């Protein structure tokens, strides 16, 4: 053997080793800095022990080979054995208690069991959202602390049906958390200090023991509470108490149960809260990523409840979380030791008993894998098409192999739900825009001192949010109510055509899939069924009937109940399987790229090699991105059933017959409210996205299909028929003590244009027919004054009448506002309805040229959600909040409204220059102008010069359609001149805050274009119009209405 290289590292001192090379408050950061100096493998001496650190993907790939290395418990983890003893995380390799607990608990963390926990996860996520909403947008939120509360409450509720209610005590953390934080910090410190130093820290040792005992007492109380009051729930706690090891038949001792309860409460929340905290830190540092993530949630979920099915449809959220965990792995290391002396990296010897720490914060930034920008936050590298191409063991934040995190699927589902819920509900901004990331270290890491502010989106109030069911929770698992044909002991059902099902399943998922398939096959004529574990098929595969195998891979190996079967197939002693007809359905998870579908593929190939006949191609289901039951059903319909028909003469009559559509007669008609307005047609939303970053007034883009008969030109308007914001509807219902489904019938509505003699639900009436936000009239004020018995209230209402313009009209105070303020008013609902006008259409400028995308239309709008001028609550724009609530597939009702003739493009765009001036969403009509010019250019026609002056707050804030306009500029369609009110010194703004100022920088160009018969267009506020007109008149003289055309909003 060639000479081995010495493992490099800083020179240790006697007794203290490398203690003085470490910042004890930030030991991890000290070690990370050493990696830059000493390379991919280095060692230091701590507490009298040499500790080796690996920092490259190539080394990690070696160290993750479980045939050569296994987990080592040392350092801070070893110190935690005082707390968690032989629990799943702290047990030594091969420790008997670990094996018993692991085999009992694995099924409790299978994909189906995790899906069933979704409703409880949603419950706690709602509590977080409600807390933030009720605190208001000015509250300073310590995001790491609140996520700690969330994750602790979630693990306790989902696994033990135990409510810690951390959000109901905002001043202090739960005692378990207080003790846990001390123990984690102290364990980390003790692992760093020399043994002699720990011996003299008597008070610290006593305090450590006190906190450990407190945590074990809490776990013991949980056990006692369940035993005193047993609950018939299929949760982790009952599994701990009643489960039996399938190998030894033993249950867990109380001490082992306590150790694992502590393990789950600590490991189940500490790292996940860090993941969430870092994820939102990176999102707020990268507004374009935040926008894309928020848009994905809006497009997939909209404003409705988040369901478990939505999570697999959020690939960008998934990539954001993976990238956050890559840069900041919250459990920053795992440790292995060789089974025998091993050479790693081709030149370093690691002896038995030596431990190697995989230093994840460095390994996961390996430029050899992730490129020169490995230190940058770029979620696209974690999208599936890129993630699947990474070298093996490039992304290991959940540890490795059989000692990897058992609760990974739980943590990931929880984190996906919380990220989606927060993005759906809030706009977040960092409290300190100049915050520099600091790391708080225990045995895990979190951001230190990172605080945010949260503002409810779409104008919701905290009350409305709490009354709105944000999530329907988990739907019943597709397999949860399935009749089980046979059982794990291999019992049969008699009669009909025979079929056998064999499954390999550790967590229960493949078993449930096999049962589901057996149940559906029962309806197709295969009523003589045998269903059992795969190991029972050794020398026992049936012939002359179909055999269906459902299995998966566990850490690259077969499941416990399939090991004998695979060994039999691999032994070479398998008799000919001629006459065996089989099909394999395999499950897997794409994150384990090296072993993805390994066992199903191997079983399929070995059976075929032994002479068995494949009925059909192998089916697969990827638990990371799809619903396993849906994938099984697709495979059954498209592959398995056709093969069974051909091979076993399964006739179509035995197939499952779907409901005959003629048995259910329905008709669909347009809403009655549509008939109250002229010329409304149906549009279907195809896209909606947010155009601005958090912290600035929200602007949105909505695009929808329109029928061919709806004629529009660039510059035209579109009427939309809105509904009132849900929070306004809830306010009205509450004021009149109505349920949303109370029925109201108008026997006579006099002059009101409301449905006659047709029941309307109270919610629909307030939502779709009446203007709830319309300012009260003077007559309304008199009517309300006459309806109150309170002299003081009457006097105040009459004062409002006398000062109507300043106190009511200008502050937009509605009748509903007044009814909520003056609770003494007794007003019949009929009187209230008669006071309100019928809900009217809202008008928006067209922001898409019909020539650019035929039969489509888009609107660009500001979402009006601001403090009410009355000083009470918030004012929500009816039309804009309605549009903001739409999602792709939504139906809305629209009609065209032509602009004035002058506010259209010149007939001859080749010879007539145009100058467009706008700010904010005033860009809308000019976007349609520019797109139409692009279509003109694409027809080979020349274009006269066009200038666009656009004012906004700044780049990456609300610079609407920036990339799109840049493309039009490059094509020669338009030249854009920007003004940024927040950053006027930006190179694009040329020192200008507002569009009128930007005009002055182009005086000569404007004058030249004016001399060549240019037309000037303006779209914006009255203030903008006033400032622009003053500049232009000084520059050009008198402006004629034929060549200076304005739209003021």
Curated annotation (Swiss-Prot):
InterPro entries noted in UniProt: Bifunctional_P450_P450_red (IPR023206), CysJ-like_FAD-binding (IPR003097), Cyt_P450 (IPR001128), Cyt_P450_CS (IPR017972), Cyt_P450_E_grp-I (IPR002401), Cyt_P450_sf (IPR036396), FAD-bd_FR_type (IPR017927), Flavodoxin/NO_synth (IPR008254)
Listed EC numbers: 1.14.14.1, 1.6.2.4
The reaction(s) this protein catalyses: 2 oxidized [cytochrome P450] + NADPH = 2 reduced [cytochrome P450] + NADP(+) + H(+); an organic molecule + reduced [NADPH--hemoprotein reductase] + O2 = an alcohol + oxidized [NADPH--hemoprotein reductase] + H2O + H(+); dodecanoate + reduced [NADPH--hemoprotein reductase] + O2 = 5-hydroxydodecanoate + oxidized [NADPH--hemoprotein reductase] + H2O + H(+); dodecan-1-ol + reduced [NADPH--hemoprotein reductase] + O2 = 1,5-dodecanediol + oxidized [NADPH--hemoprotein reductase] + H2O + H(+)
Top-rank taxon: Eukaryota
Composition bias, Low complexity: 471-482
Polar residues: compositionally biased ranges: 461-470
Keyword Metal-binding: yes
Domain Flavodoxin-like: 499-640
UniProt domain FAD-binding FR-type: residue ranges: 678-906
Binding sites annotated in the UniProt record for FMN: 505-509, 584-616
EC class of the enzyme, as a word: oxidoreductase
Region of interest (Disordered), residue spans: 461-491
One biological process term in Gene Ontology: mycotoxin biosynthetic process
Cofactor dependence: FAD; FMN; heme
Role, per record: Self-sufficient cytochrome P450 monooxygenase that catalyzes the regioselective in-chain hydroxylation of alkanes, fatty alcohols, and fatty acids at the omega-7 position. Performs hydroxylation of C10-C16 n-alkanes and C12 and C14 fatty alcohols; and thereby enables the one step biocatalytic synthesis of rare alcohols such as 5-dodecanol and 7-tetradecanol. Converts 1-dodecanol into 1,5-dodecanediol as major product with very little sub-terminally hydroxylated products with the 1,4-dodecanediol and 1,6-dodecanediol more abundant.
Entry's family note: In the N-terminal section; belongs to the cytochrome P450 family.
Protein's name in the database: Self-sufficient cytochrome P450 monooxygenase CYP505E4
Name of the encoding gene: CYP505E4
């Amino acid at each position: 053997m060639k000479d081995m290289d010495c493992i490099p590292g800083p020179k240790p001192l006697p007794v203290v080793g490398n203690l003085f090379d470490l910042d004890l408050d930030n030991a991890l950061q000290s070690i990370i800095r050493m990696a830059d100096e000493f390379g991919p493998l280095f060692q230091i001496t701590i507490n009298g022990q040499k500790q080796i650190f690996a920092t490259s993907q190539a080394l990690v790939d070696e160290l993750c080979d479980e045939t050569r290395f296994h987990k080592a418990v040392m350092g801070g983890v070893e110190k935690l054995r005082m707390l968690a003893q032989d629990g799943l995380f702290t047990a030594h390799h091969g420790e008997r208690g670990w094996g018993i607990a692991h085999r009992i608990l694995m099924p409790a963390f299978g994909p189906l069991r995790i899906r069933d926990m979704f409703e409880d996860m949603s419950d706690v996520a709602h509590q977080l959202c409600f807390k933030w909403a009720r605190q208001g947008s000015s509250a300073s939120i310590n995001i790491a602390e609140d996520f700690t509360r969330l994750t602790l409450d979630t693990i306790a509720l989902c696994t033990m049906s135990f409510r810690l209610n951390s959000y109901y005590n905002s001043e202090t953390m739960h005692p378990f958390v207080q003790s846990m934080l001390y123990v984690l910090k102290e364990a980390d410190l003790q692992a760093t200090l020399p043994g002699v130093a720990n011996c003299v820290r008597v008070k610290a040792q006593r305090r450590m023991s006190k906190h450990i005992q407190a945590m074990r007492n809490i776990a013991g109380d949980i056990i006692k509470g369940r035993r005193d009051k047993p609950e018939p729930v299929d949760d982790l706690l009952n599994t701990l108490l009643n489960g039996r090891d399938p190998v030894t038949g033993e249950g867990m001792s109380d001490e082992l149960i306590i150790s694992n309860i502590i393990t789950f409460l600590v490991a189940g929340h500490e790292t996940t809260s860090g993941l969430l905290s870092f994820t939102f830190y990176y999102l707020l540092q990268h507004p374009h990523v935040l926008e894309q993530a928020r848009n994905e949630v809006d497009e997939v979920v909209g404003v409705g409840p988040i369901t478990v099915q939505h999570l697999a449809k959020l690939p960008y959220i998934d990539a954001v979380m993976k990238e956050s965990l890559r840069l900041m792995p919250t459990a920053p290391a795992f440790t292995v030791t060789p089974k025998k002396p091993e050479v790693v990296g081709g030149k370093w010897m690691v002896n038995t008993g030596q431990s190697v720490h995989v230093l994840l914060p460095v390994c996961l930034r390996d430029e050899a894998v992730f490129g020169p920008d490995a230190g940058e936050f770029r979620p696209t590298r974690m999208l599936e098409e890129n993630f699947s191409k990474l070298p093996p063991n490039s992304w290991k934040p959940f540890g490795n192999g059989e000692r990897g995190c058992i609760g990974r699927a739980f943590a990931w589902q929880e984190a996906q739900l919380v990220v989606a819920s927060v993005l759906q509900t809030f706009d977040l901004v960092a409290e300190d825009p100049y915050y520099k990331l600091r790391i708080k270290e225990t045995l895990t890491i979190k951001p230190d001192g990172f605080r945010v502010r949260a503002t409810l989106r779409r104008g919701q109030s905290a009350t409305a949010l709490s009354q709105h069911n944000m999530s329907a929770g988990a739907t019943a698992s597709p397999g949860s109510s399935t009749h089980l044909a046979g059982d794990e002991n291999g019992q049969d059902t008699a009669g009909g055509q025979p079929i056998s099902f064999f499954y390999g399943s550790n967590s229960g998922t493949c078993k449930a899939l096999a049962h589901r398939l057996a149940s559906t096959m029962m309806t197709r004529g295969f009523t003589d069924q045998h269903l059992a574990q795969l190991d029972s098929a050794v020398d026992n595969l049936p012939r002359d009937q179909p055999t269906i195998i459902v299995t998966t891979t566990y850490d690259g190996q077969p499941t416990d109940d399939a090991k004998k079967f695979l060994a039999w197939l691999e032994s070479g002693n398998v008799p000919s399987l001629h006459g065996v007809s089989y099909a394999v359905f395999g499950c897997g998870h794409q994150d384990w790229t090296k072993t993805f579908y390994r066992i199903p593929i191997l079983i399929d190939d070995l059976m075929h090699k032994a002479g068995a006949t494949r009925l059909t191609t192998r089916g697969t289901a990827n638990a990371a991105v799809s619903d396993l039951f849906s994938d099984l059903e697709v495979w059954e319909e498209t592959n398995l059933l056709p093969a069974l028909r051909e091979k076993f003469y399964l006739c179509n009559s035995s197939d499952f017959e779907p409901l005959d559509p003629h048995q259910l007669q329905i008709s669909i008609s347009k809403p009655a409210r549509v008939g109250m307005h002229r010329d409304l047609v149906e549009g279907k939303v195809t896209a909606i996205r947010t155009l601005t970053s958090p912290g600035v007034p929200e602007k949105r883009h909505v695009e929808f299909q329109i029928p061919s008969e709806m004629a529009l030109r660039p510059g035209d308007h579109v009427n939309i028929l809105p509904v009132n914001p849900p929070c306004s509807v809830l306010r009205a219902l509450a004021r009149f003590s109505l349920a949303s489904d109370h029925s109201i019938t108008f026997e006579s509505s006099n002059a009101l244009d409301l449905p006659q003699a047709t029941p309307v639900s109270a919610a629909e009436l307030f939502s779709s027919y009446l203007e709830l936000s319309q300012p009260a009239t003077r007559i309304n004020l008199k009517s309300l004054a006459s309806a109150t018995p309170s002299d003081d209230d009457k006097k105040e209402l009459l004062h409002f009448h006398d000062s109507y313009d300043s106190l009511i009209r200008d502050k937009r105070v509605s009748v509903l506002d007044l009814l909520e303020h003056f609770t003494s008013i007794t007003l019949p609902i009929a009187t209230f309805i008669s006071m309100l006008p019928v809900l009217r259409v809202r008008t928006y400028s067209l922001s898409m040229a019909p020539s650019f995308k035929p039969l489509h239309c888009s609107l660009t709008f500001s979402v009006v959600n601001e403090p009410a001028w009355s000083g009470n609550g918030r004012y929500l724009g009816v039309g804009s909040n309605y549009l903001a609530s739409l999602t792709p597939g939504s139906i809305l009702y629209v009609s065209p409204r032509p602009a004035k003739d002058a506010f259209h493009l010149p007939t001859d765009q080749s010879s007539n220059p145009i100058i467009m001036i706008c700010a904010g969403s005033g860009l809308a009509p000019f976007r349609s102008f520019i797109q139409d010019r692009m279509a003109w250019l694409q027809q080979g026609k020349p274009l006269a010069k066009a200038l666009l002056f656009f004012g906004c707050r700044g780049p990456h804030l609300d610079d609407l359609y920036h990339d799109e306009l840049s493309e039009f500029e490059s094509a020669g369609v338009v030249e854009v001149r920007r003004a940024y009110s927040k950053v006027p010194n930006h190179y694009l703004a040329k020192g200008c805050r507002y569009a009128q100022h930007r005009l002055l920088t182009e005086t000569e160009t404007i004058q030249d274009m004016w001399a060549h018969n240019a037309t000037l267009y303006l779209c914006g506020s009255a203030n903008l119009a006033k400032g622009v007109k003053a500049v232009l008149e000084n520059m050009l003289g008198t402006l004629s209405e034929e060549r200076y055309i304005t739209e003021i909003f």
